[in-house]
Amino acid sequence: MAYKPTQTLRKLAEKSSLDIVSREFADYMDSKDPLRKMRDEFFYPRVKDLPGVDLSLVDGDQDSIYFCGNSLGLQPRGCRELIDRSLTKWEQMGVLGHTSGWCPWKPIEDILIKPMAEIIGAKDIEVVAMNTLTVNLHMMMVPFYRPTPQRYKILMEGKAFPSDQYAAQSQVHFHGFDPDKDIIEVFPREGEQSLRTEDILSAIEEHGNSITLVLFSGVQYYTGQFFDMKTITAAAQKKGCVVGWDLAHAVGNVELHLHDWNVDFACWCTYKYLNSGPGGIAGAFVHEKHAYNFELPKFAGWWGTDRNSRFQMRKEFEQIPGAHGYQCSNPPVFQCLLLRASLDVFEKTSVKEIRAKGDLLTAYLELLLLHYFSPSNDITKNGNTPHVSIITPADPKDRGCQLSVKFSVPVDKVFEELCKRGFVGDIRHPDVMRIAPAPLYNSFADVHRFISMLNAAFKTITPNS
C-alpha cells in the first residue's frame, strides 16, 4: 500500500486534538520531530541580514524562511573549525602538511568516500569526489558515450537543466553527429507537467536500438519530479543502452540505491542538499561492474594512477580500479573539508530518516497551499485572492522535498513581496517558484510561517497587477 504522508498528518492532528492548519499543530509536529536538533548544526540566516527586506513588515531578529536548500544548502557550523585547522597546519608546516599532521592532504578525498557511498547506496570503490558537476558529466561521457554508426543517440528528458543539455550537445557534436537530430527528448503529454514513466519506457523501446546513452536527472530541477530510476535503468540496459544520471537535486534529498539499481554512472554537485558551500566539489559514481575495465577510454591524469607508484613519476598510467581511476588532479583540500563538515551532520542521522521527515514536511506545505490558495478554494474563487497551482507530482514517491508552484499573478511580484518579509527561495523563469523545505534544518513552523507570509504578500497584489 502506498505511503501517504498527508493521511499521517491528519491522523496526528486528530490524535493531538489540534487543527491541522493551526500554528499549534506545526509546533506539535516540531516537538515530535526526531531531527529537530539538526537545525542547531547549521548557521541559519536571520531576517535582518538579508538584502531587500522591509523591516517595517517583519521582525529583523527572527530567523528567515530559508526554503532554498535545493539551490544552496546552509553552512554547517563545523566548517570553520575544519578550515581553520588546515589553515593553521599550512601556516606551520607548508608542503609537509600533505603527509603529516591533522588530516593529511594527500589522501584528503578518503574522508568523503564512506559517508557519500552511504548516502547514494554505493560501494566505496564506486564513489569519488572530484571536479564540478558538468565537468564530471563530460568525464563520464568519455567512456560511456561511445557512438557507433548504429548507436549514436542520447535520450534525455525535455527541458533538462541547461548545463546538461550543453554537455550532451557538445559531446554529440564532438563525435560528428547532429545534436538537433541525435538527441531525443521526452516531454510531458499536452496539459501535463510531469513525465509519465510509461512514456519514457516507450521512447526507450522505440528508439533503443539507435540510443547509446540514456542521460536523465534523478530529480528534475524545474518540476521537482523524482524519476523511477530503477525501472528506467533496467529498461534502457535491456535495450543495450548505457544509463547515466544527473543527481544534483537527488543526493541528500531522496533515497538512492545506485549499486543495486545497476546504474552505469552518475554525477552530482554537493552544494545543494549536501551543504558543501558555493561551487563545492562534486561527486561521481561508476558502477563496480566497470571497475576493472581498464580498456574504457578516459581523459586521464596523475591522480587516477595507483597511489603506490604515483610519485615515482612513471610514464605508464596504472589506473586505480573503480571511480577513483577517473580523477585527474588532486582535489581541492578546503572544498573537501567543507563537504566533510556537512557529512559529519549526515552521519548523525540517515537518508531514510531525512526522507521520512521530508515527506511529511512537503506534504504539510502542500496541504496548507491547497487549503488556502487552491484554484477551487472558496476564497480564491471570488477572483480577489491569487491562487496557486502545484506542478510537482502529487504522489510522494515521485518527488523529493521541492514543490514547484505557479501563481495566477506574476511570479516576480509574489517573489518580491515574499523577499521583503524574509523569504529565501528562487524562481525559474518563465513562471515557476521553487519552494524546498530541507528536512535537516527546516521545521513545520517554518512552513506555517511561510503560508502566513504568502497570504500577506497576496494581500498586496491584485489579480491584474
UniProtKB/Swiss-Prot annotation:
The modification N6-(pyridoxal phosphate)lysine is found at residue 272. It is found in: Cytoplasm. It comes from the Eukaryota. GO terms for cellular component: cytoplasm. Its EC number is 3.7.1.3. Keywords: Cytoplasm, Hydrolase, Pyridine nucleotide biosynthesis, Pyridoxal phosphate. Pfam families: Aminotran_5, KYNU_C. GO terms for molecular function: kynureninase activity; pyridoxal phosphate binding. It catalyses: L-kynurenine + H2O = anthranilate + L-alanine + H(+); 3-hydroxy-L-kynurenine + H2O = 3-hydroxyanthranilate + L-alanine + H(+). InterPro entries: Aminotrans_V_dom, Kynureninase, PyrdxlP-dep_Trfase, PyrdxlP-dep_Trfase_major, PyrdxlP-dep_Trfase_small. Its cofactor is pyridoxal 5'-phosphate. GO terms for biological process: 'de novo' NAD biosynthetic process from L-tryptophan; anthranilate metabolic process; L-kynurenine catabolic process; L-tryptophan catabolic process to kynurenine; quinolinate biosynthetic process. Pyridoxal 5'-phosphate binds at residues 133-134, 161-164, 217, 246, 249, 271, 302, 330. Pathway: Amino-acid degradation; L-kynurenine degradation; L-alanine and anthranilate from L-kynurenine: step 1/1; Cofactor biosynthesis; NAD(+) biosynthesis; quinolinate from L-kynurenine: step 2/3. Catalyzes the cleavage of L-kynurenine (L-Kyn) and L-3-hydroxykynurenine (L-3OHKyn) into anthranilic acid (AA) and 3-hydroxyanthranilic acid (3-OHAA), respectively. PANTHER family: KYNURENINASE. Homodimer. Belongs to the kynureninase family. This is Kynureninase. The lineage of its organism: Eukaryota, Metazoa, Cnidaria, Anthozoa, Hexacorallia.
